[in-house]
From Swiss-Prot:
EC number: 4.2.3.5
Cellular component annotations (GO), alphabetically ordered: cytosol
Record's subunit section: Homotetramer.
Entry keyword annotation includes Flavoprotein: yes
Keyword NADP: yes
Source organism phylogeny: Bacteria, Pseudomonadati, Chlamydiota, Chlamydiia, Chlamydiales
Protein name according to UniProt: Chorismate synthase
């Protein structure tokens, strides 16, 4: 089982949804970066349950620093972080442990390994992403030294969406962080969609977009470690992610070359582009433009409606998520912080690689 991501700036996550704790080890972070437990609070609180449309499971997600820090600064050694699980209820899972959960990784894990932890989804649960968000905090602090900033936000829920990529600014970022849905979309419309989901006991997918400040470093390694390839690998590893695009993405198929190509211009003394259909990457390398992309998330499979399945002995039956279970009617809202973290982790890794690319 591969639990490590990254090359020079890497993370290894461990732990299960209903285990005593989860954790992550970050390797490759340069020494001298200021870091304290308080630095993790804003990002962890954005991923935590408690917002409308999220799971009622109550987890503080306090990050405990176990190693790699001395006198408030990174030492260059591995940084170990630990997050305790404090609100676990495994009974609803044990009651239907004789059958497979449709739409979940349980069947695939058991088929591959011959054994699986079914409680709360075990290792395949979205709970694992708390570790990624914690690691992403460190990556973001490192990138800030190079004036590279990333922001993710909910850009589509149901029929409510924003198609364009806004320009990154600290003011826009703060407006997203202050939003109960981490979104520039109409809050009343989102709240109504979530209310309808709760009333019908159903779930819904969505889209998370990400934007960055202009990246003047040449990040990305031809030909197999292009920036968009690394982002795709990172973002598609998030639970429930089903699609990724950069820039104009799949809409590029409907454009003529004369419409799609981004004209090169001089702006403020720098080579720039009049548009950014490419999403900030040419030849798999960043070119001084913002990186823009989107990730599509499926509806969560944990709904309070029966679905056909079979028992572990092969007998037809049904599975219904028990009333005592705690799940998100729209997991996309809490995926916002995970997308932001994974983009930061990719960029931090590529930035370290770029430091080795030329004299």
């Amino acid at each position: 089982m591969r639990n490590r991501f990254g090359s020079l700036f890497s993370l290894t996550t461990w732990g299960e949804s209903h285990g005593p704790c989860l954790g992550v080890v970050i390797d490759g972070c340069p020494a001298g970066l200021q870091l304290s437990p308080e630095d993790f609070v804003p990002a962890m609180s954005r991923r935590c349950p408690g917002r409308p449309g999220t799971s009622p499971r109550k987890e503080a997600d306090t990050v405990h620093i176990l190693s790699g820090i001395y006198q408030g600064k990174t030492t260059g050694t591995p940084i170990a972080l630990q997050i305790f699980n404090t609100d676990v209820n495994s009974d609803p899972y044990r009651e239907q442990d004789d059958r497979y959960r449709p739409g979940h990784g349980q069947f695939a894990y058991e088929k591959k390994y011959g054994i699986v932890d079914p409680l709360g989804g075990g290792r395949s649960s979205g709970r694992e992403t708390a570790c990624r968000v914690a690691a992403g905090v460190i990556a973001a602090k490192f990138l800030a030294h190079y004036d590279i900033h990333c922001l993710a936000f909910l850009s589509k829920l149901g029929q409510v969406s924003i198609e364009e990529y806004p320009k990154y600014s600290k003011e826009f970022a703060q407006s997203i962080y202050n939003s109960p849905f981490l979104s520039p979309l109409n809050h009343d419309a989102i709240f109504q969609i979530i209310t309808d989901l709760q009333n019908t006991q159903d779930s819904l997918g969505g889209v998370v977009s990400f934007i960055t400040s202009p990246i003047h470093e040449s990040l990305g390694e031809p030909v197999f470690s292009k920036v968009q390839a690394m982002l795709a690998s990172a973002l598609m590893s998030i639970p429930a992610a089903k699609g990724f695009e950069i820039g104009l993405g799949f809409a590029s198929a409907d454009r003529y070359g004369s419409e799609y190509i981004d004209p090169i211009i001089i702006e403020d003394g720098r080579i720039s582009m009049r548009s950014n259909n490419c999403g900030g990457s040419l030849g798999g390398i960043t070119i001084g433009m913002p990186l823009n992309g989107r990730v599509v998330f499926k509806p969560t499979s944990s709904i309070h409606k029966p679905c056909g399945t079979v028992t572990k002995t092969g007998e037809p039956t049904s599975y219904v998520t028990q009333k005592g279970s705690r799940h998100d009617p729209c997991v996309t809202i809490r995926a916002v912080g995970v997308v932001e973290a994974m983009v930061n982790l990719v960029l931090a890794d590529l930035l370290l690689q770029q430091r080795c690319a030329r004299l």
